[in-house]
Amino acid sequence: MKNAFKDALKAGRPQIGLWLGLANSYSAELLAGAGFDWLLIDGEHAPNNVQTVLTQLQAIAPYPSQPVVRPSWNDPVQIKQLLDVGAQTLLIPMVQNADEARNAVAATRYPPAGIRGVGSALARASRWNRIPDYLHQANDAMCVLVQIETREAMSNLASILDVDGIDGVFIGPADLSADMGFAGNPQHPEVQAAIENAIVQIRAAGKAPGILMANEALAKRYLELGALFVAVGVDTTLLARGAEVLAARFGAEKKLSGASGVY
């Protein structure tokens, strides 16, 4: 079994991604052909469930873009279900400390290395037990990315990086800026300093730093600092802003977004 996304991170090859929030397999397949290295299927803030994640994994599968799935929480039951339908790379939100990072890793591993329940006869991941020796290969194919999104998590970054099985650490600029007192302003100098320091620390520890940033100059800056998986846009934003621009060309009143920063 292989995980092309995990292999790319290990090799130090920067991976450029796009966030998927439309919760739709048709749009997921459309974007899978756009040329991004990875696509994030969002189960935290988008209206996804296990079934809609499954259909998007199926839609993306024929294309080179690699799927990354974000569950709504660091929940072993939800993680088990997502792995069974075929997710190999998970982005676990709001991890605050090393214990929570260890719990995330354990949820992705079969015993004795972890606590993932064995149900491979029912699982797309094992091709319903058609993959020889799946139970002994699956653990090594898992890629666990954890999100640090608060000052507490930042203060615990060194211990999080020491956890075996953590492949990458994703910095959540929207939540981090809010926690630091600068909600809606991830470009504040204090937030940017925290992000840049974290990227350097993560890379120095031999892990892959990641982030979502639609600002092109900042995204490129993070890549220069050593970020290895960077999402540079969101499908809902691309659709909404693109539609507004087109309508405005034909006289429609431009609807100004009140949001700023990351997306």
From Swiss-Prot:
Q: Where does a divalent metal cation bind?
A: 149, 175
Report the GO terms under cellular component: cytoplasm
Q: Does the keyword Flavoprotein apply?
A: no
Annotated GO MF terms: 4-hydroxy-2-ketopimelate aldolase activity; metal ion binding
Stored InterPro entries: Aldolase/citrate-lyase_domain, HKHD_aldolase_ent, HpaI, HpcH-HpaI_aldolase, Pyrv/PenolPyrv_kinase-like_dom, Pyrv_kinase-like_dom_sf
Q: What is its EC number?
A: 4.1.2.52
Residue positions of the active site: 45 (proton acceptor)
Give the cofactor binding note: Binds 1 divalent metal cation per subunit.
Q: Which SUPFAM superfamilies match?
A: Phosphoenolpyruvate/pyruvate domain
The site annotation (Increases basicity of active site His) covers 84
Biological-process GO terms, alphabetical: 4-hydroxyphenylacetate catabolic process; phenylacetate catabolic process
Annotated protein name in UniProt: 4-hydroxy-2-oxo-heptane-1,7-dioate aldolase
Organism name:
Salmonella agona (strain SL483)
- Gene label: hpcH
